[in-house]
Amino acid sequence: MKVLLVNGSPHKAGCTHEALQYVGNELVAEGIGVDEFWIGAKPIGGCMGCYKCAERGECVMSGDKVEEFLAIADEYDGYVFGSPVHYAGITGNMKAFMDRAFFSNQGRVTFAQKPAAVVTSARRAGTTAALEQLEKHIQYSQMFQVGSRYWNMVHGAAADEVAKDEEGVQIMQTLGRNMAYILKCIEAGRAAGVPLPAPIENRVATNFIR
């Protein structure tokens, strides 16, 4: 089993990376493989709403971190998406990354029925609002959202300050253990012949105005 930690910060080794490492260390201790994917600091174009992905099965915008991520995403059994807080929300690059990665993937089963978690980091405030943004992609995509003993956030203005947020560190550690447990439960269920929930046939999309 493997989990992919997605670092949505423009700083490769900043506070978000530190938070993800605490999660990852617990996963490794439980025998779960871990890799980290950094979305980078180069601009990522946002979704244009062209719906070409519905025809092509992939986003028309290519050659960036979204394409690179989707090329490997199928290999993983779970995901942790992290972002720093910019103006009480996730970074602009992370928003563009998440929107395109998830929306262009709707016709495939990369994410459905896999566990996922989200984490945020900030100097002071805005973490809960940013968490809610990330959670939307998880909840929409039929994933099993993993929680901890508090909202999944750490605080610090620099990477070395995250360790001083002792409660935040424990929240990340608990999250890692919970993620490992869910992964093992899914594996045990599969081995015991317990199937994952069957999809609803003939999915309906109802517009509010028609």
What are these regions (language model features)?
Residues 7-8, 12-17, 45-54, 77:
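Cysteine-centered iron-sulfur cluster-binding motifs in ferredoxin-type domains/subunits
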Residues 58-150:
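Helix-loop-strand module that forms the ligand-binding subsite of alpha/beta enzymes
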Residues 2-30:
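N-terminal beta1-alpha1 ligand-phosphate binding loop
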Residues 42-74, 204-210:
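Cysteine-cluster motifs in flexible loop/terminal segments that predominantly coordinate metals
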